[in-house]
Design a protein with these regions (language model features):
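An acidic-aromatic pocket/loop used at catalytic or ligand-binding sites
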Residues: 1-113
Length: 113
């Protein structure tokens, strides 16, 4: 459905309207940032790019970006939410496990135009 694999065990959190007919999808994972980046490097056959060191954020481009028709470039972004100042991204499901996700996956699917 999204055009890229979802990391095994990742939990859907929410999708948002990105504008221009696009949506982005947020998933939480109990896996480490390093494990998620390794998974997506393998399945996408792309090394991606570390765009921020702190908090660690890694992006993979998965399609062509057309600034005339798209709000965001299609891609997969992995963000490390665990640090000295954060115990992780809160699980929005009451009583959901884990209580906090150390890592978040954001997917902007390829939209045919």
């Amino acid at each position: 459905m999204l055009g890229v694999p979802i990391y095994p065990g990742a939990q859907f959190i929410r999708s948002y309207d990105a504008g221009r007919g696009q949506r982005y999808y947020i998933f939480g994972s109990a896996a480490s940032f390093v494990d998620l980046v390794g998974f997506y490097r393998n399945v996408l056959k792309d090394k991606g790019e570390l765009v921020y060191d702190v908090p660690a954020t890694h992006e993979f481009d998965v399609g062509k970006y057309n600034e005339n028709t798209m709000a965001f470039p299609p891609g997969v972004t992995i963000k490390d939410f665990q640090s000295d100042v954060s115990r992780g991204f809160p699980n929005p499901n009451p009583g959901g496990q884990p209580a906090r996700f150390p890592t978040i996956i954001q997917i902007v699917p390829v939209v045919a135009r």
